[in-house]
Amino acid sequence: IIKQFDLFAKNGVKNIKIADELFVLNPRHFIAICDMIIERKYDFNIWAYSRIDTCKPQYLEKLKKAGVNWLGLGIENPNDVLRKEVHKDSYQEVKIKDIIQIIKNAGIYPAANYIFGLPNETQESLDFTLNFALETNTEMVNFYCAMAYPGSPLHLTAKKDNLPLPSTYSGYSQHSYNTQNLPSVFLSSEEILAFRDKAWKKYHTNSNYLNLIEN
């Protein structure tokens, strides 16, 4: 992997996105990469990803020194009950706001990723997630709808419950005209999708967010 970074540096590439959504997972892997970047004194501006429950404070100084200035966080949902239903085998309860603040204090910009429409999502929990995102006010945010991607636990559950699934690949896209997200027990897929679009607009026109990115 370090040879790829060597090639980037040789060709003057500064901005790098590491498209591994579990990059900050195994310290023996990502710390070794960071150490080699630091040893070479490369001046990169890196975007990397981490699960919210694997982003430990002791990693942040090393990540920052290697050039990781943006960290995409898989928050999914701030409601512990909803998250636990999806991640029964690997679920860990974490204080999300505290972790985000620690990341900010390390000089790294957090990018929060949220999912609307987990199996027992209600209108109240949708509102809670949006309000949480507004209060946390990260430099970047993504709002997704729960999608039954083939091979995922949600896909297996959807097939078991005879839920409608996309018949084309574009139906699995978050932003295609024929996107087909999952309904929850309490909300239709259309209601969840409409809320996602509303949340996107509300967040990015919110005065606190605009002040953050302007300053």
Model-derived segments and spans:
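Glycine-rich Rossmann NAD(P)(H)-binding loop
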Residues: 19-23
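A structural motif corresponding to the C-terminal lobe/cap of the Radical SAM core domain
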Residues: 7, 24-214
